Amino acid sequence: MAKMWAGRTDGITEKIADDFNSSIHFDSRMYRQDIEGSMAHAAMLAARGIITQSDADQLIDGLSQILQDLDNGTLTIDLQCEDIHMFVEQVLTERLGDVGKKLHTARSRNDQVALDIRMYLRGESDEIAALIRQLITAVTDKAEEYRDAILPGYTHLQRAQPITFGHHLMAYAMMLLRDVERLADCRRRMNRSPIGCCALAGTTYDVDRNFEAQRLGFDGLCLNSLDGVSDRDFCVELMSALSILMMHLSRFSEEIILWSSWEFKFVELSDAYTTGSSIMPQKKNPDMAELVRGKTGRVYGDLMALLTTLKGLPLAYNKDMQEDKESVFDACDTVKMCLKVFTGMIETLKANRANMKLAAQKGFINATDLADYLVKKGMPFRTAYKISGQLVAQCIQENTVLEELPLEKYLAHSDLFDNDLYEAIDLMNCVEKRISQGGTSVASVEEQIRLVREALQA
């Protein structure tokens, strides 16, 4: 069958070429944006006197009916069409005759698809941001529940200083909050209308680009027609933001995987978010966390695929750009699923306070506080640091811990030690003394929770 774009050629192509060229299998998900954009375009054409109001009314009514039919399932997308734009125009022309052929006046598929994908990704950005907010709420609620649960803090995966589980969780809440901010910033740049840029050079018709932009909820226009149809940096930026988000989820997943192991036993995952083994009946595998960690690489791959596609393209539109959609659609779909699963996993997670505290009692994570004790009594920090290290070495040799080392052995290193040192190196006291803004004390964590909840309400 001849194509709507048949002009210089007869429009008849081999089936294998049709299949290779077609994008309707994946761009059909943008049917709503395509139809809404066309309705705004028809209204603008009439407002500028390019077509009659009667024709515009027929076009808008016809498009509205197509949208309704697609929504309720009485119309099925024909996957033999080249793309969603051609499908909608074909159905419209079949129903309206020559009036349907007027819709594409002062428009190209180049600006049409750029419009559709901006509108579609605008919605995806909003949905993903809402899902991140739900996850932040789950993390923050869990942090409040465990704001006083002692946990060993790590550097280099070695026990470092005592913190609380609530403090650790709030670190991820802060990261996720920045992910929401990145999406909002990305959306702001994305929300510029390319319609009216036409194929690449603009149009000879007296169009009103602002009319369509305002009607479709855009904040402004793409101010150069070549740029409007030929760049996909807004896709790249969105996928970059999603990659950073997935990096945060992957790090969180890695810790959950470690914490849920028998070697740590810091957390217990709900049976609803774990799986078993086909051969080992004792297993309870953190598959959801592992899949999130694994799917992070998939989203990274989507980003790199699009960057690689775009890097060598001359202006303006090239068919290579059809490859933008599968990558960005896959990234959005993957991220949404990961966020939904992750939120449920966090909501049902239970922490083992006893095991976390037991782990914190090993590894001399109060050694810094021991040094600070001497500093507050007038000793230079580097001297105090050295003495604290010597005492740790002595404890290791004697198979004991700082809290149980007798006072006389402390006095052998410095006469500044007194009985009050045991209070200074008590783990909960070590936590509660860290009152600096953003610190791990219960009061500080509660303030972090308050600030995040306040930000979520903004």
Region annotations inferred by a language model:
Residues M1-G37, D98-V99, M280-A458:
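Glycine-rich cofactor/substrate-binding loops
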Residues H41, G62, I66-D69, V91, ...:
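Generic, well-ordered alpha-helical scaffold segments in large soluble proteins
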Residues H41-I51, Y120, H167, V236-I244, ...:
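Short, well-ordered beta-strand elements within core beta-sheets of diverse protein domains
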Residues S54-D55, P152, C222, T383, ...:
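A generic structural-conservation signal
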Residues I117, R122, A129, E144, ...:
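Charged, flexible cofactor/metal-binding loops and thiol motifs
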